[in-house]
């Protein structure tokens, strides 16, 4: 144990990192925070990616997680009207089966709400064009034409949970924004630490395109032409 700690401190002193990007999973994350504290590295200079941003990543670390930052595509907490609506119409009505109500508003719980919004609205978008009965390719079209502007988010009660979304054939992300959140170990809750921030799309998209082109070539997949309406809306998948 002593040797391992000495080695960790040696790495810290030799590399002298300003920040450390944490790309952990499961128990790796709280262990990283506890190790940072033991070696004198500020946990406030650990920045977690989306696999290191949940309540389950910080709570096991206890006080060692205080001040830890993580990126998130959606803030934690009861940040949107739709969350209050779910609490009122589902849980207070005795219809929910969530055993631990403290999970309401947690990172993964809010992600589930957001997934429900996206899937439902994409299905409705497809049904508006093709009718009530849709196949998988038509649902894909619904996702590729999903528009959630401010008025739509307001109507859904999702304002504050996610930025405006505009998914297309060319852009399956639909918005390249994220926020940073910081953990308050005393209150056991995340607090938003930034506005919506756009990543370096030019850099990331080039990497995505390169990987996609290779995958298509290796698997004999014909690339769709999103500028060609007939090819873009080809439903014979």
PLM segments and residue spans:
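Single conserved hydrophobic/aromatic residue that forms the stacking wall/gate
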Residues: 1-11
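Sequence contexts marking disulfide-bonded cysteines in secreted/extracellular proteins
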Residues: 11, 168-170, 225-231
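Conserved C-terminal helix/tail region of periplasmic/extracytoplasmic solute-binding proteins
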Residues: 141-154, 184-237
């Amino acid at each position: 144990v002593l040797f391992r700690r000495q080695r960790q401190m040696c790495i810290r002193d030799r590399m002298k990192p300003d920040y450390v990007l944490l790309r952990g999973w499961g128990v790796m994350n709280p262990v990283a925070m506890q190790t940072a504290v033991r070696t004198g590295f500020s946990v406030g200079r650990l920045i977690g990616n989306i696999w290191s941003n949940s309540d389950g990543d910080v709570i096991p670390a206890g006080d060692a997680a205080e001040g830890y930052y993580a990126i998130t595509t959606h803030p934690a907490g009861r940040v949107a009207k739709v969350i209050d609506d779910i609490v009122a119409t589902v849980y207070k009505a005795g219809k929910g089966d969530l055993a631990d109500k403290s999970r309401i508003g947690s990172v993964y719980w809010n992600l589930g709400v957001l997934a429900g919004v996206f899937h439902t609205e994409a299905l409705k978008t497809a049904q508006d064009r093709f009718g009530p009965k849709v196949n998988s390719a038509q649902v894909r079209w619904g996702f590729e034409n999903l528009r959630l502007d401010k008025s739509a988010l307001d109507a859904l009660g999702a304002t504050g949970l996610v930025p405006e979304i505009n998914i297309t054939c060319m852009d399956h992300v639909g918005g390249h924004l994220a926020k940073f959140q910081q953990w308050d170990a005393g209150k056991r809750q995340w607090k938003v630490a930034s506005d919506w921030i756009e990543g370096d799309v030019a850099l990331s998209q080039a990497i995505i395109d390169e990987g996609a082109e290779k995958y298509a070539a290796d698997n004999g997949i014909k690339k769709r032409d999103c500028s060609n309406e007939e090819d873009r809306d080809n439903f014979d998948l």
